[in-house]
From Swiss-Prot:
Family from the record: Belongs to the PAPS reductase family. CysH subfamily.
GO molecular function, a single term: 4 iron, 4 sulfur cluster binding
Protein name as annotated: Adenosine 5'-phosphosulfate reductase
Catalytic site positions: 229 (nucleophile)
Cofactor(s) needed for function: [4Fe-4S] cluster
One Gene Ontology cellular component: cytoplasm
One BP term from GO: hydrogen sulfide biosynthetic process
Protein keywords: Cytoplasm, Iron, Iron-sulfur, Metal-binding, Oxidoreductase
Annotated source species: Bacillus cytotoxicus (strain DSM 22905 / CIP 110041 / 391-98 / NVH 391-98)
Matching Gene3D superfamilies: HUPs
Amino acid sequence: MLTYETWEEDSMSFSERDETKGALAVLEWAYKQYNDEIVYACSFGVEGMVLLHLINEVNPFAQVVFLDTNVHFCETYALIERVRQRFPKLNIIEKQPGLTLEEQEDKYGKDLWEHNPNLCCKLRKILPLEELLANKNAWISGLRREQSETRKHTKFINQDHRFQSIKICPLIHWTWKEVWRYVYKHNLPYNPLHDVGYPSIGCEKCTLPVGKYGSSRDGRWAGSVKTECGLHDQ
């Protein structure tokens, strides 16, 4: 089994010539390699809908984790229930932070996401995933190279120094149009916020709609230099 400790650069290759641009082959390899020792960390954005559909084909009983910060859009929570109905065998869990919002406010002050968003992300997303991955050898992410400069060198299989794990990214070669084409083709549920200017959807407090010519990440932490929650930092 390939682990963080036994990592070998470029030890695997996958054909990218099928409809899924290699994604299905990567997932088949991942679940054969790791079985129950892998989890998909899903934000339930539109890329997530594609991955959930593909994962369901490979392993309908796969574990999926949603990092519930307790400040997501109500549309996101509603979508999770629709996904549960569409893929009833998937093991979808909602991972809670160590602190409630009230406990966080008592300890760090009101509206931490405004005056220290990095700490807020650490408490409500990074530490919960870190706790979960302590018992796993690998995790799956919906990163695409097209999304941003910080993601353009992502590979199918990555040594993840942040979580000392293996990070699997099946959709690296997909474009925004290809993602939506797949969603429409398979009649997949998706967050209605995508239809009103939200290409990337995170916590309600830190996500804004973007203009017609904005990039897919422009609405996240708008007005600050922050571009990532920290899950994908190396």
